[in-house]
């Protein structure tokens, strides 16, 4: 059972809003140019868990993610910081696009992105199509989690999430990537 909870309680009342700069242009010419992110909910063994993913629009690779049983700012900030630390040497600016969720609009998250000179973009309120790539990914991700990995039988949810991300990044071919998995496509484009 993986239905979203309505309005989970989170800390912080600040709510920054940013323009929809991505504007449904879900194509990137190179890695680390446009990153989309969102959080999904997974019920496992009677308890809600939260998965934040960051997806590179160049090749639809999940470049980082965080699984937690706590729906707080660290859920989205930990992977964002890891990505930005790795990308310090990137010459061009990176765009991060999200919905207007509390974590993505918090002062802590917005300040983190500013400190790395990231362009922040947000979907319009109530418009999930503005972040369609990650929304669609989560649908496929949960289908594979259910059917292929049968996550409900496993005691270690983190291990199953890791295996599912590995499957999407290294094994599952994508039509838009000439029938290659995301990591293989990225490596071949760099060669």
Predicted features and spans:
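C-terminal domain-tail junction helix/linker
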Residues: 107-110, 114-118, 140-191
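Active-site beta-loop-alpha junctions of metal-dependent nucleic acid enzymes
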Residues: 66-89
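RNase H-like two-metal-ion nuclease catalytic core shared by retroviral integrases
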Residues: 8-13, 98-100, 106-107, 122-142, ...
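Short small-residue beta-strand/loop micro-motif enriched in glycine and branched aliphatics
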Residues: 61-65, 120-123, 146-148
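Mobile genetic element proteins and their domesticated derivatives, centered on retroelements
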Residues: 22, 38, 54, 60, ...
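An active-site-proximal beta-strand-loop segment
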Residues: 24-63, 69
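Basic, flexible linker segments flanking DNA-binding modules
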Residues: 1-30, 127, 181-189
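Short coil/turn segments at beta-strand junctions that form active-site/ligand-binding loops
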Residues: 92
